[in-house]
Amino acid sequence: MPSDSLATPDAVAVDTAGTSATKQQQILDAVLAVLARDGISGVSMRAVARQAGVALGLMNYYFADKTSLIAAALRRLGDQDAQLVEPQEGLPPREQLVRSLHRVVGDEFLSGDYLALRLQLWALAPVDPLFASINQEAQERYRDGLAQLVALASPHLAPEEAAQRAADILVVQNGLWLTSMLIADRDAIDRSVRRCEEIALAP
């Protein structure tokens, strides 16, 4: 009878997949750290491998080149943005919307490192059509998620109106992040959030 301590092929496959995903996330964390610290010019396969503490050969196993590496990092940031506007079970729609509007000005999103990273990633849009496409897709995905929250909080709104409000809020939020890189003004940030609430919850 086989020992319980022996891993089945399926268990080994799951463990291998988990390790692979962890390594890739470790590498993407390193890409974002290098981008925030050194800008796009500082990103290389070797620099990211050093930051991640992995062998260069492992980098090349997961990512073909610098472009694919940065593209993956952009997509990851887009996923994180989308999570900010995901509906949360158990909360009234209005509260979900208000919480989402406040989450974007949490300390983690107003730190110097994060704002520098955000600026670097946005600056990639004119550099390469692939980066532009990923950036645009991420912005649209966030905007559409926000429009859904607006619609849930105000069911009487036409879909077009909810979408327009989400688009207007996105402009304010992006401007907030950019300005916060240059001027640390908490009062202005709080007013901007209140303005977003007014846009979202207008009758």
Predicted regions and their residues:
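Hydrophobic alpha-helical connector segments
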Residues: 85-115, 163-169
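C-terminal peripheral helix-coil segments that are non-catalytic and often amphipathic
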Residues: 1-11, 143, 152, 179-203
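Amphipathic alpha-helical packing segments from all-alpha helical-bundle domains
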Residues: 86-88, 110-119, 129-154, 194, ...
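Helix-turn-helix
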Residues: 26, 30-68, 72
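Hydrophobic alpha-helical segments that form the core
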Residues: 116, 120-122, 159-182, 189-199
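Short loop-to-helix capping motifs
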Residues: 39, 124-129
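N-terminal intrinsically disordered/low-complexity leader segments
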Residues: 1-22, 33
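Short, basic, alpha-helical segments at the C-terminal edge of helix-turn-helix-like DNA-binding modules
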Residues: 75-81
